């Protein structure tokens, strides 16, 4: 009798994706983040579902409904903080996952990479709308500032913003629709994840050397399932340490004040994972220019396959490119720090220089260094 795992129409798909999948024998811990992102998505959907059972998307009661969840619902505080800090863990894994793709040249799988960038946009949109829901000061003003950016679009901008708001300011209609979108997007993300995996399994995984690994494959189970379980345990340990010891470490104290349209917080800033993009936005004095730079700072990821001029796929054997890559990482840390600082000297000029460096490294320095390395190979 043939194994049901290999014959059943549904189980067969799971088998080919997670059990008998041929995987390169040399993929490192940097390849763990795909499964960790899957876990983060599951955690967010489950905790989010339980939060939605008690949350009310009305401007009068939203803030107190979150308070009610934390005080009166059984383990409500745990669910709420797992959801809030789960988003931070999600983005840490996302950034590391994208960084891995850049370092090892995984972007040469065009379809997988482009779906991944679309996923990044979708997760960022979901996180932004989720941040608005508790209806604290930073929720309200963050929503006002970020949605207002669309007014920079010529001709249709103002109409577009009022259409998104559902009125002439961020109000009840805005909160209700943000809740609706925040609820539906994770399911759209899940569907996109399936497409992402579908494209990945068409080509097979990349590996640290960037070389074709068809001659040396091992089954995904048990080798990489056990490796993923280690990553999962470490992720849960980190998340629960954060949730149980300092749940507000990454949050903003201003969000414990109910939203007040008449009082602007001294420093409006988004959650930490958007700070690098926020710094790029602020570094350009022109509104439309800033918005374009903000969008392009993420969209530029789609250009990587076109900007890849090296004869080698991975950076494993390219020390010059490695140096530039880590300078780019340091630059992103700098931008994240600047995004959280007030708009004053010397932060303004540091932010502008870091923004210029970000685009210069990606569009100019990395391709040039790749060509120099190609020349060095001939010596």
UniProtKB/Swiss-Prot annotation:
Compartments where located: Mitochondrion inner membrane
A Gene Ontology molecular function term of the record: metal ion binding
CDD domains per record: cytochrome_b_C, Cytochrome_b_N
Residue numbers binding heme b b566: 97, 196
A single Gene Ontology CC term: respiratory chain complex III
Binding-site list for heme b b562: 83, 182
Cofactor note: Binds 2 heme b groups non-covalently.
Keyword set, alphabetical order: Electron transport, Heme, Iron, Membrane, Metal-binding, Mitochondrion, Mitochondrion inner membrane, Respiratory chain, Transmembrane, Transmembrane helix, Transport, Ubiquinone
Record's function text: Component of the ubiquinol-cytochrome c reductase complex (complex III or cytochrome b-c1 complex) that is part of the mitochondrial respiratory chain. The b-c1 complex mediates electron transfer from ubiquinol to cytochrome c. Contributes to the generation of a proton gradient across the mitochondrial membrane that is then used for ATP synthesis.
Extra remark beyond the main annotation: Heme 1 (or BL or b562) is low-potential and absorbs at about 562 nm, and heme 2 (or BH or b566) is high-potential and absorbs at about 566 nm.
Database matches in PANTHER family: CYTOCHROME B
UniProt protein name: Cytochrome b
Organism: Spermophilus dauricus (Daurian ground squirrel)
């Amino acid at each position: 009798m043939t194994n049901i795992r290999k014959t059943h129409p549904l189980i067969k798909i799971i088998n080919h994706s997670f059990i008998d999948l041929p995987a390169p024998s040399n993929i490192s811990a940097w390849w763990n983040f795909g499964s960790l992102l899957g876990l983060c998505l599951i955690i967010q959907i489950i905790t989010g579902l339980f939060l939605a059972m008690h949350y009310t998307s009305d401007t009068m009661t939203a803030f107190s409904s979150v308070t009610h969840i934390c005080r009166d619902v059984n383990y409500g505080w745990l669910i709420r903080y797992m959801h809030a800090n789960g988003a931070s863990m999600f983005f840490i894994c996302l950034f590391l996952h994208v960084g891995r793709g850049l370092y090892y040249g995984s972007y040469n799988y065009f379809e997988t990479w482009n779906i991944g960038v679309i996923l990044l946009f979708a997760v960022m949109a979901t996180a932004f709308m989720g941040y608005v829901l508790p209806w604290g000061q930073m929720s309200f003003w963050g929503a006002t500032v970020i949605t207002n950016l669309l007014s920079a679009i010529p001709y249709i901008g103002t109409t577009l913003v009022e259409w998104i708001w559902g009125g002439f300011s961020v109000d009840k209609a805005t909160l209700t629709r943000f809740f609706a979108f925040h609820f539906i997007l994770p399911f759209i993300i899940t569907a996109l994840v399936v497409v992402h995996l579908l494209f990945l399994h068409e080509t097979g995984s990349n590996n640290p050397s960037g070389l074709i690994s068809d001659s040396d494959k091992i089954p995904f189970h048990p080798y990489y399932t056990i490796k993923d379980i280690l990553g999962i345990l470490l992720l849960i340990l980190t998340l629960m340490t954060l949730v149980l010891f300092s749940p507000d470490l990454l949050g903003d104290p201003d969000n414990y004040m109910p939203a007040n349209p008449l009082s602007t917080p001294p420093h409006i800033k988004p959650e930490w994972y958007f700070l690098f993009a926020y710094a790029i936005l602020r570094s350009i004095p022109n509104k439309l220019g800033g918005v374009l730079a903000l969008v392009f700072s993420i969209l530029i990821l789609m250009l990587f396959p076109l900007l890849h001029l090296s004869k080698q796929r991975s950076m494993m054997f390219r020390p010059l490119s490695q140096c530039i890559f880590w300078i780019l990482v340091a630059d992103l840390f700098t931008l994240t720090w600047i995004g959280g600082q007030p708009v004053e000297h010397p932060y303004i000029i540091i932010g502008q220089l870091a923004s210029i460096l970000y685009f210069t490294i990606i569009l100019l320095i990395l391709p040039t260094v790749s060509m120099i390395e190609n020349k060095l190979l001939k010596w």
